[in-house]
Design a protein with these regions (language model features):
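Extreme N-terminal leader/targeting segments of oxidoreductases
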Residues: 2-95, 113-114
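C-terminal accessory subdomains/tails of enzymes that are appended
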Residues: 3-8, 124, 177-180, 184, ...
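N-terminal Rossmann-like FAD-binding beta1-loop-alpha1 element of flavoenzymes
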Residues: 93-120
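Short hydrophobic core segments
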Residues: 97-98, 295-305
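Glycine-rich FAD pyrophosphate-binding loop
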Residues: 112-134
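Glycine-rich active-site loop/strand segments that organize a redox cofactor
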Residues: 127-161
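Helical element adjacent to the flavin cofactor pocket in flavoenzyme catalytic cores
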Residues: 239-299
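A structural signal for short hydrophobic beta-strand segments in well-ordered beta-sheet cores
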Residues: 272-275, 356-357, 436
Length: 728
């Protein structure tokens, strides 16, 4: 056979193979497409069918799941903190929980509703640590599912499925604090369309009947219509999928209050001095601070997050540490940075991380980073991490939008409690999920995991307590579907009743309903008359935020003991806007001083501690670092003008502006952070440069300096610190 004939014989065979491959690929694609089409239609029908049932079931207590009396709306007021402490001192408990974050609170609620007498103590405030510093998402973990598919990892698949079940449960048991949020995944390369579409559809499929709503693809035009700030260049389209969002600190508190309503004794600002053991070396209680009284308990649960090892060392000084904390930084930007009802996911940042960009509490939260760190009671956000997040945001937003350092209203660092699994041979490998360790002395340690799965973690921890300490619960786990504080009589239009019945402003009523649920009426009854035709009641703490002075009084009933408890966790103001938090601080402290009978010394202490918290843990100090790094970019004329204004402020003629003088002028600003409380001329020049470059944006300082120079442009609108996106 000649060479030419052999080539002719080969060509039809090659074409046949190609046709078979194309037919096979088409067939597989058709089957997959048909499967997802059926799944979409089925899920959509189920969603439409169940949606109304969901809202009706939460509209009135009479129609909520009545399988257990535990789900009836509790009547009466909460016990006082003094009553809880007395009960803790006088009674003997089945379980003592150390740690008042999401997991510890979940353990207390689970154990108490099983009929086990439970106490909980927290060194600081409920949710004062990692649980209040999250990304505010209730999610299954899209990236974990991606890893499960790519690596055929069954363990990660089970993690995602478990988290998606818990996501649905949280949305059901606290609908006033949580809600579905559409998240956009913008696509800039054509090959990413089928890749991400398949991954997101798998996320829907794993959700099963717990799906929130089906994901879908939109083209470039619709993507820009929905998210106008998005970068237009090379945009192909976007995928929209759904996850949950919540108010994390308030959710944590709702779990604690629900445990207390069911009979648990939970106290914040109580530390464990040391653990008590019986003659057999088994734990039998703990010695607490304050009056140094012992709490007797048959079983002790260590749910202290990043501080896990400190309690483990109390039980066994020779134990090996297992916690390897990682710092995650988030920043808050003004609300105009994102649409009010759509988030954004950057699935692959410049260093391989994932960053979320989400609307939250009428602002925009962005994060997170992931950096190994040391354990700290007061973690501070690093300016380098803040700049990294801003850089990633710039890469996704329209080039016409100037993403400024001065627009960062708040920033915080949360310690993620990554742990090694002591139950495995390779004890240095990080556990992908949570771990439960039972020590020789019967200390039950629950560590790792994430916010979404707190309830499942708590269930497993209580199961371990029952087994290890031979406890006798009256029933099994009752927490799936157990309504949390404020959820029983909540329904989506409850805020209208507040407006009509009490004469409260609409945005304030929405805030009250979505923060306190059916307890919003209690807060409304505590409000004072405004003396105006409208609103009739409800005096705001700050004109730009819906928080009321009556909420400070109610926060005390919710066991707020310090000013930080109020501005950070009962209200979320320090997480949203540090400038506004400084401005309301005096009023908050005065209300608390009156209600709690603080001495003058205690009042001054509370003011100082709260200011330090805002400056150090909420990002003001990092802001000053960024200002000090600004290069001088002033002309000779601008430097002369700055010097004249500096001299006008320097009343003592000592070539420095002291924090006391500055505070008289600017209120509670952060000038005192520079040069150990003094602002020198060189630093004043840097401030001017920051104002010029956009590192610092319009605020009272700018207006005051303009007034000093007699150059105030009355035709130019002066924006409030909130609307301008920050300030010094």
């Amino acid at each position: 056979m000649s060479a030419s004939s052999s080539r002719k014989a080969f060509v039809p065979l090659s074409n046949a193979l190609r046709r078979r491959k194309l037919l096979f690929g088409f067939g597989v694609g058709t089957v997959i497409g048909a499967g997802f089409y059926y799944m979409d239609k089925n899920n959509e029908r189920r969603f439409k069918r169940d949606k109304d049932v969901y809202f009706v079931s939460n509209a009135h207590a009479a129609t909520v799941d009545t399988k257990t009396a535990l789900n009836k709306r509790p009547s009466g007021s909460l016990p006082t903190r003094a009553e809880l402490l007395k009960g803790m001192r006088d009674e003997e408990f089945d379980i003592l929980v150390i740690g008042g974050g999401a997991t510890g609170a979940g353990v207390a609620l689970d154990a108490q509703t099983r009929g086990l007498k439970t106490a909980l103590v927290e060194l600081d405030d409920f949710s004062s640590g990692t649980s209040s510093r999250s990304t505010k998402l209730i999610h299954g973990g899209v990236r974990y599912l991606q890893a499960a598919i790519m690596k055929f990892d069954r363990e990660q698949y089970k993690m995602v499925k478990e988290a998606l079940f818990e996501r649905a449960n949280l949305l059901e048991i606290a609908p006033h604090l949580s809600y579905p949020l559409p998240i956009m995944l913008p696509i800039y390369k054509l090959w990413q369309v089928p890749y991400y579409w398949f991954g997101i559809k798998m996320y829907d499929w794993v959700s099963g009947k717990r799906i929130l709503k089906n994901s879908y693809y939109i083209d470039k035009e619709k993507a820009l219509e929905r998210f106008p700030m998005l970068k237009k260049e090379s945009l192909k389209g976007a995928l929209i999928y759904y996850d949950g969002q919540h108010n994390d600190a308030r959710m944590n508190l709702a779990i604690v209050l629900s445990a207390i309503r069911n009979g648990a004794k939970c106290c914040n600002h109580v530390a464990v001095e040391h653990l008590l053991k019986d003659e057999n070396g088994k734990l039998c209680g703990a010695q607490l601070t304050g009056e140094l009284f012992p709490v007797r308990a048959k079983c002790i649960v260590n749910a202290t997050g990043p501080f896990t090892d400190s309690i483990r060392l109390m039980a066994d000084p020779d134990t090996e540490p297992i916690c390897r904390p990682s710092a995650g930084v988030h920043i808050v930007l003004p609300g105009y940075y994102s649409p009010a009802n759509t988030g954004l996911l950057d699935p692959s940042t410049t260093d391989g991380r994932v960053i979320f960009f989400l609307p939250w509490q009428r602002m925009t939260v962005a994060g997170t980073t992931d950096s190994p760190c040391d354990v700290s009671f007061s973690p501070k956000p690093r300016n380098s991490d803040i700049e990294f997040i801003l850089g990633e945001i710039r890469g996704y937003l329209n080039k016409d939008i100037s993403v400024r350092r001065g627009d960062v209203m708040s920033a915080w660092s949360g310690l993620r409690p990554l742990v090694n699994d002591p139950n495995k041979k390779d004890t240095k490998s990080l556990a992908r999920n949570h771990i439960i360790e039972v020590s020789k002395s019967n200390l039950i340690t629950i560590a790792g995991g994430k916010w979404t799965t707190y309830r499942h973690m708590a269930e497993e921890a209580v199961d371990a307590c029952v087994k290890a300490c031979n406890l006798k619960p009256k029933n099994g786990c009752m927490t799936p579907g157990l309504m949390l504080e404020g959820a029983h009589d909540w329904y989506p239009l409850l805020y209208i009743n507040l407006v009509q019945d009490y004469g409260i402003e609409v945005d304030v009523a929405q805030h009250l309903a979505n923060t306190y649920g059916d307890r919003a009426f209690v807060v409304a009854r505590m409000c004072k008359m405004t003396g105006k035709r409208w609103p009739i009641v409800g005096n705001r703490l700050h004109e730009e935020f819906p928080y009321l002075d009556a909420e400070v009084n109610y926060a005390i009933k919710e066991y707020a003991c310090t000013a930080v408890d109020v501005i950070a966790r009962r209200l979320r103001l320090s997480f949203l806007n540090t400038y506004a938090a400084h401005e309301v601080l005096n009023q908050v402290v005065m209300i608390m001083a009156r209600e709690l009978a603080w001495s003058r010394q205690e009042t001054e202490k509370q003011l100082k501690v709260a200011r330090d918290f805002i400056n150090n843990e909420m990002g003001q100090e990092a802001r000053m670092q960024s200002v000090s790094d600004v290069p001088l970019n002033l002309t000779k004329e601008e430097m002369q003008m700055a010097k004249e204004r500096f001299n006008q402020l320097d009343k003592d003629k000592k070539d420095t502006l002291r924090s006391m003088t500055s505070a008289d002028t600017f209120g509670s600003t952060t000038i005192k952070l520079m040069s150990n409380g003094e602002l020198e001329l060189a630093e004043f020049f840097q401030l001017y440069s920051g104002l010029k470059s956009g590192q610092i944006t319009q605020n009272r300082l700018v207006r005051y300096l303009d007034e000093l120079g007699g150059e105030k442009d009355k035709t130019k609108p002066v924006l409030d610190v909130v609307r301008s996106g920050g300030g010094f």
